[in-house]
């Protein structure tokens, strides 16, 4: 009798997994395989133009014929990912340390910090475009009161830092929540023992709290790195990929859907972006796992 119920339970488990597997297949596996296949063709999606298999010609074009453009996009991608990953985690860690303290309206400030995480990327991009626009934006107006021009917003020097800032602002809430959850798991007795030993608040945090939230650091660093390496929508809305913000995501989008619409070459860029993301994530995971073991 138990075998019958056990078999039914397993069947029920498999049935509940089917919808999720179908979604993963339709929106994960099939598009990924299709992109890989298209990267070996000269597909343009132009009606009447046949698609031909070209082998590694698209990849040769990127690494040989147009290496300078690919290199610039790769550098921009790594700069963007490094800036977002480092500062998003630093600010998130600081914010979580503050918001785990007991003070009036702490729940209000927690909600305020998390609010950007529920907004759409397009909404965030358009909102900050209006805020930072040099012609009539509120930031430009405030700077004009001090006799400072806001023309530097569109310069090569400031475009990337501003995009990094907006990306951090958009995702800081989620990062902070993960750190808050990690900090709340640290036993209060450990902090009390550190205080008795004469540890200051700063020393208490770095010597007691930080080593014990290493898993939270691993999660946040990997999510921030993976997310920023494949970001293109926010950059598209804010700068359209100009002023040194032409990341691999923007390079892929412009190649595939702008101008000649070379979907084959764009797919090749997408494959390389995916490979880069996998490599960076694996390296970070291996390093951070070692750090966790060393701290435990």
Residue locations for each model-derived region?
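A structural signal for multi-pass alpha-helical bundles of membrane permease subunits
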Residues: 4-296
């Amino acid at each position: 009798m138990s075998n019958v119920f056990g078999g039914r339970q397993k069947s029920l488990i498999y049935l509940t997994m089917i919808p999720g597997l179908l979604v993963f297949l339709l929106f994960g596996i099939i598009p990924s395989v299709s992109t890989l296949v298209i990267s070996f063709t000269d597909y343009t999606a132009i009606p009447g133009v046949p698609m031909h298999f070209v082998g590694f010609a698209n990849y040769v074009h990127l690494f040989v014929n147009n290496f300078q453009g690919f290199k610039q996009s790769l550098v921009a991608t790594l700069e963007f990912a490094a800036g977002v990953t480092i500062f998003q985690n630093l600010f998130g860690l600081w914010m979580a340390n503050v918001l785990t303290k007991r003070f009036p309206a702490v729940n209000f400030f927690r909600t305020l910090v998390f609010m950007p995480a529920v907004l759409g990327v397009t909404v965030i991009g358009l909102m900050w475009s209006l805020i930072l626009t040099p012609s009539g934006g509120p930031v430009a107006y405030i700077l004009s009161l001090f006799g400072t021009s806001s023309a530097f917003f569109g310069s090569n020097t400031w475009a990337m830092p501003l995009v990094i800032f907006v990306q951090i602002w958009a995702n800081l809430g989620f990062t902070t929540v993960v750190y808050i959850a990690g900090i709340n798991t640290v036993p209060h007795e450990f902090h009390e023992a550190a205080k008795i030993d004469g540890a200051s608040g700063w020393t208490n945090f770095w010597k007691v709290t930080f080593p014990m939230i290493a898993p939270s650091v691993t999660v946040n660093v990997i999510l921030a790195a993976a997310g920023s390496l494949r970001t293109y929508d926010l950059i598209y809305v804010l700068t359209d990929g100009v002023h040194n913000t032409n990341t691999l995501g923007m390079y892929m989008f412009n190649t595939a859907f702008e101008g000649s619409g070379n979907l084959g070459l764009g797919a090749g860029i997408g494959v390389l972006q995916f490979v880069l993301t996998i490599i960076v994530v694996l390296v970070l995971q291996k390093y951070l796992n070692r750090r966790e073991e060393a701290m435990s």
